[in-house]
């Protein structure tokens, strides 16, 4: 089973939520039982992955159901990528000029093995970081690639940490060619239009202004300190993308027992898609 529903505004999702939310907890439990019996398939190749290779390491199903270096939300993003390729919106993986904003993660290694023209990087502001010189160092606010150099950009769990999100979105639009795509996963304030602002950036050499108790998420290249959350984007993110130069912006709600795509609070995973 694979279900993808596309939303371009909050109200269209609210209608579904009001109609279906009471039955979602039972649907999640049934899906878990199905995965335990049948296993899943790889999101790009459709190769079967048996149940004994699935790892569920906690209750947050969006971040687990791990297999072959991918978790639930990452498979959701790759399903959307595959659909764009199959629809002729993007070139096949062996010809696709792609950038992913991570380089040392299992997800990055999965792509590095399949996308010959992949560029990958980490954010390494410290001049003495041990990864300097081993992987590319890029700031998502200014990727540093020529205009229209890319056909696809993937960002996973990045936008909540970006100090100047509007600036980053403009920069991403500039490095994509006309018709190129941004795909991203992020924690979403799915019930509201406004983003939840948790901290404000005040400059490179100034501590950020904290508007609430600081929230830190895990960061594979800064495991001791993590990464500060500046905002949890709401549905206004779609309008921010349109202002940044994207012709279309939408959120895909993906769920699939066949591919192991589930959430817990919601039985879906949101994948952001924006077309240049």
Regions found by a protein language model. Give the residues of each.
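Conserved N-terminal segment of class I S-adenosyl-L-methionine
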Residues: 1-148, 199, 256, 260-274
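S-adenosyl-L-methionine-dependent methyltransferase catalytic module, highlighting the catalytic core
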Residues: 2-20, 26-40, 127, 163-275
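Aromatic-residue hotspot detector
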Residues: 51-52, 150, 244-247
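Hydrophobic beta-strand segment of the Class I
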Residues: 153-154
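A short His-aromatic
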Residues: 157-161
């Amino acid at each position: 089973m694979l279900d993808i529903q596309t939303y371009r505004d909050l109200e269209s999702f609210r209608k579904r939520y009001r109609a279906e939310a009471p039955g979602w907890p039972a649907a999640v439990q049934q899906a878990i039982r199905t995965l335990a019996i049948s296993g899943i398939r790889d999101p790009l190749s459709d190769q079967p992955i048996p149940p004994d290779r699935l790892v569920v390491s906690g209750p947050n199903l969006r971040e687990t159901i791990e297999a072959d270096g991918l978790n639930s939300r990452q498979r959701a993003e790759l399903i959307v990528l595959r659909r764009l390729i199959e629809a002729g919106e993007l070139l096949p993986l062996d010809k696709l000029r792609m950038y992913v904003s991570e380089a040392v993660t299992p997800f990055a290694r999965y792509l590095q093995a399949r996308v010959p023209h992949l560029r990958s990087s980490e954010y390494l502001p410290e001049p003495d970081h041990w990864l300097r010189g081993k992987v590319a160092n890029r700031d998502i606010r200014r990727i540093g690639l020529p205009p229209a150099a890319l056909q696809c950009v993937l960002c996973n769990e990045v936008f909540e940490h970006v100090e100047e999100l509007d600036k980053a979105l403009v920069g991403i639009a500039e490095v994509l060619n006309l018709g190129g795509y941004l795909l991203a996963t992020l924690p979403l304030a799915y019930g509201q239009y406004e983003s939840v602002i948790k901290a404000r950036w005040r400059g490179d050499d100034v501590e950020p202004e904290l508007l609430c108790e600081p929230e830190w998420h895990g960061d594979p290249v800064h495991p001791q300190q993590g990464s500060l959350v500046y905002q949890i984007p709401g549905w206004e993110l779609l309008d921010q993308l349109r202002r940044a130069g994207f012709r279309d912006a939408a959120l895909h709600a993906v769920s699939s027992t066949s591919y192991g795509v589930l959430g817990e609070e919601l039985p879906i995973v949101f994948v952001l898609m924006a077309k240049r």
